[in-house]
Amino acid sequence: MNFLEIKGLRVFYPESSYSLNVDSLEVKEGETILIAGKSGSGKSTLLNSINGVIPHEIEVEEEGEVKVFGINVRNSTIQQIARFVGTLLQDPDSQIFNYYVIEELAFGAENLNIPREEILYRINKVSQIVGISHLLNKETFRLSGGEKQRVVLGSILIMNPKALILDEPTSSIDLKGTKEILTTLRGLKEKMSMIIAEHKINKVLEFVDRIIILDKGKIIYDIKRDHVKEVDFEDLGLEPLRPSPLPKKRRDGEVILEAKVKVTDGNRTIVDTEIVLRKGISALIGDNGSGKSTLLKALAGILPINLKFYGSIKVEGKEISKLPVEKRGEIIAYLPQEIDLMFTKKTVKEEVSYPAKVRKKYDERVIKELLKRFNLPEDRDPFLLSVGQKRRVAISSLLATGVKVFLLDEPTTGQDWYNRKMLGEELRSIDATFLVVTHDPLFVYYYADRVYKMVNGRVIPISPEDVIKDW
């Protein structure tokens, strides 16, 4: 039996010229498929058409036929489809609803009225498969990104699906977490069908059977793994399978920011380090929970109320650590991971323009150039954009202010290689100072002038070339 059969699928979004157009697609039971393509190419739309989110949850115009294990998706409910097909999303926090790991694992199975004894048996079995047996009694909010993804994956597997759909499962987790989740998926290959949408092509190539590449809503390649050398991925705006020789010289700019930062919660020290930022791009890498985001918030002056800052922050020799947040914001711009919290306007152009208008730095030409450079639809609602597009809106809104020091927390999350390159080129062209927190070794290798690694709350300088060794 085929896991998936698609015939004449057309998906049209209201108020958008974008569409998905798949004439025919079959996936055999037991196959593992990689779906690749630039942001906006139709990957998520295709996955949502398979798991029933389209047409049952997202309002679109659609036609054609989608069957999973012989069941017509349009004529079934999402709950019926979920018994056969489990879905793992980019952001694990969006799929976690319970306080303890064991409660989270049991949650879906309980909703299916599975007997308690059977649920406990499945929890024991699945927790070993995904490597979370030691986490069963841990609070979910204390987990790392990789641990959260494995917990969500475990909660899906407990419901015994016949297939998995994974929408960029490694995009929001660190390098350690990425290795953990990919190792788990590799072990599941022989047990079920899988469709994986992923930008990190070289990381999943070794265990997929086929590669399907989308462009502008259409399938342009459907090849077996053995024929992967026939495709120039970078020419398609996708990650290359191997990094090319470094194209640009690393710069050694003047010192702009000098800081001594100590952050505590009253019981333990979270960050205790010194850092010097020179003009140009400095990258900050490190495992989830090492203190990277806390350091950025300390520099920006927006630590949570339960955390205490000690130290000094000097920009161009002037102490700013005592300045109120609004004054410090005229010197340092901060991009959080939770970018939805930044949005207040109804259109992309209004959102990009707003911070510049508040600071009386508005320039129509600058706004138009940013919208063009970052390929942003100026009249769209920013809340309805993809994860990658939302980040480009938020970054553009900061760049429009003319601030000279930028703290960017995970700006490449959810972005394809084309847009990550565009971001890197844009940052390099600006006469400013950037500290970029990222789990993206390719971006660091190509665009960072300096690299720091956060280890247990301390910043350690490392070589950009070291970042790419295990890529």
Swiss-Prot record:
Residues the record lists as binding ATP 1: G37, K38, S39, G40, S41, G42, K43, S44
Domain ABC transporter residue range list: 4-241, 255-470
Protein name: Putative ABC transporter ATP-binding protein STK_11360
Sequence positions that bind ATP 2: G286, D287, N288, G289, S290, G291, K292, S293
PANTHER family attached to this UniProt entry: ABC TRANSPORTER ATP-BINDING COMPONENT, HEAVY METAL TRANSPORTER
Keywords: ATP-binding, Cell membrane, Membrane, Nucleotide-binding, Repeat, Translocase, Transport
UniProt main location, coarse: membrane
Function field: Probably part of an ABC transporter complex. Responsible for energy coupling to the transport system.
Domain of life: Archaea
GO CC annotation terms, alphabetical: ATP-binding cassette (ABC) transporter complex
PROSITE patterns: ABC_TRANSPORTER_1, ABC_TRANSPORTER_2
Record InterPro entries: AAA+_ATPase, ABC_transporter-like_ATP-bd, ABC_transporter-like_CS, ABC_transpr_CbiO/EcfA_su, ECF_ABC_transporter_ATP-bd, P-loop_NTPase
One GO MF term attached to the UniProt entry: ATP hydrolysis activity
SMART domains per the UniProt record, alphabetical: AAA (SM00382)
Any single Pfam family the record assigns to this protein: ABC_tran
Membrane topology designation: Peripheral membrane protein
EC number(s) stated in the UniProt entry for this protein: 7.-.-.-
Location(s), subcellular: Cell membrane
Family classification: Belongs to the ABC transporter superfamily.
